[in-house]
Amino acid sequence: MQVKIITVCGSLRFKKEIMEISENMELNGNCILPPIYPTRIDKDAYTEDEVFMLNKMHKEKIKLSDAILVVNVNGYIGNSTNSEIEFAKSLNKEILYYTDFIK
């Protein structure tokens, strides 16, 4: 069986759902690259350079992936996630949506 590498994209407000679906996808034989969750309570504690690096590394994950999984709870897709979708499309990556798995 060919292992599919999938980067998870979505709003961090859906952390619980992202963690659950990431686990389920790995249990089904996929290699999952989840987003990094901020550890600093105050988002302003991150410098511009740190925010830039986190975003850059997430895009590197997308480059390495066969597909991205968009965790779009209740159909919500924010601006950052939308830009990740467009980036993945520009690389001809497969786009999977969380809402397609829960029907």
Briefly describe each language-model feature range.
Residues M1-K103:
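Conserved catalytic or regulatory cores that recognize and/or transform ribose-phosphate-containing ligands
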